Regions:
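Histidine-acidic metal/acid-base catalytic patches
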Residues: 1-12, 84, 139-158, 162-247
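Short N-terminal secondary-structure initiator segments
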Residues: 1, 27-41, 127-135, 161-168
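Active-site beta-loop-alpha junctions enriched in small/polar residues
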Residues: 22-24, 48-51, 91-93, 129-133, ...
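Active-site-proximal flexible loops/turns
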Residues: 27, 52-55, 94-96, 136, ...
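N-terminal pre-domain/capping segments
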Residues: 1-79, 103, 113, 120, ...
Length: 247
């Protein structure tokens, strides 16, 4: 509840330094920028909120065209907010005949390439996120996908909780990605219990922190959680501080 300014003031009071915004969203962008300037909360990234439903890997060209429009919109919104990344899930392996791994790879690459000139013009990076889409499930695949674009305006958005499911330690994903990793987020995932609160999963945080140090990562660490009011956000902040060894 409350205005965007109220929300920014709340997260600021709890120790958060930045947030990400959805694109598109029903938030007034001018109000968000004013709240950013008034509170000092950084809008560090934008999330393409249509990438699951309107996929760049869809078998229908008209759907892919619409998905590209939303990706470009996310890049434009990121520039407006002063953010440096637009998060993108590039596709989903949804059908063995019409949307399989090879098709998702080829189609998503073709569409993302169309957005790279705009990303370069705006100075905003397309940040590819790894999720449960049955597409990129190993560090080697992630590296190969990113490197195939040969662009400084595309990198990896690594979710270390999502990838626990696939068997390779999050720290090893990070080491493999190296400087390709432009953003980093997490929640909490346990192999035996599923989604859990931050810090109660199987991420192996000492190893994750060691890996982040080894690759020289000093960017944003984002909690991808549902949030809530002051009580819930305070708990998130305390958990983040604990696992990141900030307190």
């Amino acid at each position: 509840k409350g205005s965007i300014r109220d929300k920014f003031e709340l997260v600021k009071s709890l120790g958060f330094q930045g947030v990400e915004m959805n694109s598109p969203s029903n938030i007034n962008k001018e109000e968000a920028v004013k709240a950013r300037d008034d509170t000092g909360i950084v809008i560090h990234g934008v999330i393409d909120s249509k990438h699951w439903q309107i996929r760049l890997s869809d078998p229908k060209p008209e759907v892919r065209e619409e998905g590209l429009k939303y990706l470009k919109g996310a890049l434009e919104d990121a520039k407006f907010y002063g953010a440096d990344t637009a998060l993108l899930v590039p596709g989903k392996v949804a059908n063995p005949k019409t949307e399989n791994f090879d098709q998702v790879w080829a189609r998503s690459q073709a569409e993302v390439r169309k957005a790279l000139p705009l990303a370069e013009k705006l100075g905003v990076k397309i940040a590819i996120e790894v999720v449960w889409n049955d597409f990129i499930t190993t560090p080697d695949q992630f590296v190969r996908y990113i490197d195939s674009f040969q662009s400084p305006y595309l990198g990896g958005y690594f979710d270390c909780s999502n990838m626990v499911k696939y068997g390779v330690k999050p720290g090893d994903w990070i080491r493999k990605l190296g400087k390709r990793m432009v953003k980093f987020d997490f929640k909490g995932y346990s192999k035996s219990r599923g989604w859990v609160p931050i810090g109660e999963g199987d991420e192996d945080w000492p190893d994750v922190l060691a890996a982040l140090g080894e690759i020289g990562y000093d960017g944003w660490a984002t909690a991808e959680v549902s949030g809530g009011g002051e009580k819930e956000l305070r708990d998130v902040a305390e958990r983040m501080n604990r696992i990141l060894q900030l307190s």
